[in-house]
Amino acid sequence: RLGTPAVRPGDALFCRTDVRFTHDYVTPMAAALFREFLGAEARVEGTDSTYAFRDHLTFLDRVMSPKHREMGLLAHANALKTTQEAFCKAQGIRLYDEVPGGGSEAICHNAVLEDIALPGQLVIGSDSHTCTAGALGAFAFGVGATDVANAWFTKDIRVVVPDVVRVDLHGAMPDHVSAKDVMLKILADPYIKEGKAIGQVLEFAGDGVTRMNLDERATLTNMAVEGAATTGI
């Protein structure tokens, strides 16, 4: 998968992705880059493992202020929707779209965790909380439009191997304590508060993690990005 038997922190290489997804803010930007640099006839590679979500802007028409409407922001947002739909249709990408009455078929990072990603996979997404899928034991992290456009065409992503910090959890949580409480405590640790975890991977381990269900583990990995980590696993 990597083309080399082993890697160490700091190594830079291209890795083959297993899952690629974008939401409604980034799909149009990545599509524009895709067409500009690869040509109008370029095709997305691996559409069976490529997904798009309309989940960030679905209620915008209900909450946008009159002032912002007058500025034309709602029209711009609707243009993002049209562009995303057209690109997905042309390329054969599965789009989790709006549903009648408002809302979306799915929230991207939740759907990837629940229905798409598998343990051991490499998952990239345009959402900062792509790291949620780390609860499965996947290496999942957020990327920008340029990386997405490249991965659409090649299925590859450039990775600088990050350092790993292990977080050992032991014992059982009392009834009044949730996984979010645990993660907030971790985020308050000086190691993270002083920025030492920036760009690193938070590896959660120990019998305390073993006792957690998947939703609780997903809370830990979802919030890894709040400590400026690349991901949690």
Give the ranges of each region predicted by the language model.
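Fe-S-dependent hydro-lyases/dehydratases of central metabolism
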Residues: 1-233
